[in-house]
Design a protein with these regions (language model features):
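A signal for specific C-terminal beta-sheet/loop modules enriched in small/flexible residues
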Residues: 88-97, 101, 295-309, 395
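Hydrophobic alpha-helical segments, especially transmembrane helices
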Residues: 13-14, 95, 276, 381-383
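Penicillin-recognizing serine hydrolase domain
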Residues: 2-10, 34-62, 166-343, 358
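Compositionally biased, intrinsically disordered low-complexity segments
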Residues: 13, 21, 29, 352, ...
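Active-site-adjacent loops and short helices of periplasmic peptidoglycan-processing enzymes
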Residues: 2-11, 18-201, 205-210, 214
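Conserved SxxK-family serine transpeptidase/carboxypeptidase catalytic domain
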Residues: 309-395
Length: 395
């Protein structure tokens, strides 16, 4: 367990077994990676255990099934655990949806929603409250996606983009371009579907790519917005990113987004980005097993660790450059310019500060949007996620 004496003994035994003494280079065992796990970003990222360079600060205690810490600008991966493990992404997949569709429509464009636009939204979806017959700007629809994780807003934008099927095809193509090879897209909203998976590495790629777009960056950093309620009326929506708003957990200084997610199957997943001292870090945490706040607390702890380690610890891998941005004929999985390769100096050590549970018990609580009367009814509320143990389906 991270921080436990047992993990210390594991690393010590491994070192003794190899006869390498205190300078040993070992990797803590972890859950087996998916059979199709890729080593995009460096050989060490294909391993299932904790990957961190020797001499790095002590890692915090963590319960996530997979996580990753990376420098947004250099692409250096500072530490990871099961980086390529394929897991259900929940609404964090909306980052790929936004990265794919957001550049296609001007934010001031207006769309009058039809019933057909709202067809096929899964029961139990998180909703912002889009109504057929009401006109919305593209900006308002994206606010519904980023702030409230509204699947109704996602489906309207997908309809504008040629339909759900076409949007899924484009998202998969974009994932391929980003070299997010662990990701299989079934729906644009991230809702639970058989075979819909991503990884901590891929979600970090989506966030890194998305944050290059000023609109993407602005939406995920927005705390509140007024959303149309029909006619001239509006109601306020609040971002469900708790590290941004400070709802239920302490807000994180310097946080700039990006996206949280929850389903009853996927558990809690979050990719966050923060800037301090001119350095921007990305952290993805997938499926911690200890309550709905854990995903935020573990993200904050890893951000703190990353800012302490950046510039001091050698990277264990890299966020690769999109294929479309590489010179023609360049090999896939090329590191970013200036980024250290997976074989950089600094041997892996047993991260005795870190332990990982490997069960599928996840906590969560929130209000559930409802389907009724042949239409979509969204509950106006200050926060979809609220403490108290009430089960939620997606957020």
């Amino acid at each position: 367990m991270p921080g436990s004496s047992s993990s210390h003994h594991v690393s010590r035994r491994a070192a003794l077994a190899l006869g390498l003494g205190a300078a040993a280079s070992v990797t803590l065992p972890g859950p087996r990676a998916a059979a199709a796990a890729s080593a995009v970003g460096g050989e060490r990222l294909g391993r299932s255990g904790v990957q961190v360079a020797s001499g790095a600060p002590r890692l915090p205690k963590l319960a996530a099934k997979a996580w990753l810490v990376a420098d947004h600008d250099s692409g250096d991966v500072l530490a990871s655990y099961a980086a390529h493990r394929a897991l259900p992404p929940a609404s964090t997949l909306k980052m790929l949806f936004a990265d794919t569709v957001l550049p296609k429509f001007g934010r001031a464009s207006v769309h009058r929603v039809t019933a057909a636009d709202l067809a096929g939204i899964p029961y139990g979806s998180s909703l912002v409250g889009v109504q057929a017959g009401t006109s919305y700007t593209v900006e308002q629809l994206w606010q519904g996606v980023f702030l409230r994780s509204g699947n109704d807003a996602v489906h309207v934008l997908a309809s504008m983009n040629g339909g759900v099927g076409e949007t899924v095809r484009q998202m998969q193509a974009r994932a391929k371009d980003l070299q997010a090879n662990d990701t299989h897209v079934v729906s644009p909203d991230g809702f639970d579907h058989k075979g819909q998976v991503s990884s901590a590495y891929d979600l970090t790629l989506f966030a890194c790519a998305g944050l290059k777009n000023d609109d993407f960056r602005g939406y995920c950093a927005t705390k509140t917005a007024d959303f149309p309620a029909g006619g001239t009326k509006t109601f306020q929506i609040q971002n469900t990113d708790r590290l941004l708003t400070g709802q239920g957990v302490a807000s994180y200084r310097g946080l700039i987004g990006v996206k949280n997610g929850y389903t009853s199957h996927a558990g809690n997943t979050f990719t966050g980005a923060a800037t301090r001292g001119g350095r921007t870090l990305l952290v993805t945490v997938m499926h911690p097993a200890s309550g709905y706040e854990a995903v935020y607390r573990e993200t904050a702890a890893l951000l703190d660790w990353g800012f302490a380690a950046a510039g001091k610890a050698d990277p264990v891998g890299t966020l690769v450059t999109p294929l479309s941005e590489q010179p023609k004929g360049a090999a896939a999985a090329k590191p970013r310019a200036g980024a250290a390769g997976a074989g950089a100096a600094g041997a892996p050590v047993a991260a005795s500060a870190t332990s990982h549970t490997d069960d599928w018990a996840f906590g969560g609580s929130a209000a559930v949007a409802v389907l009724a009367g042949g239409g979509l009814l969204a509950l106006r509320r200050r926060e979809r996620e609220r403490p108290g143990g009430r089960r939620r389906r997606q957020g």
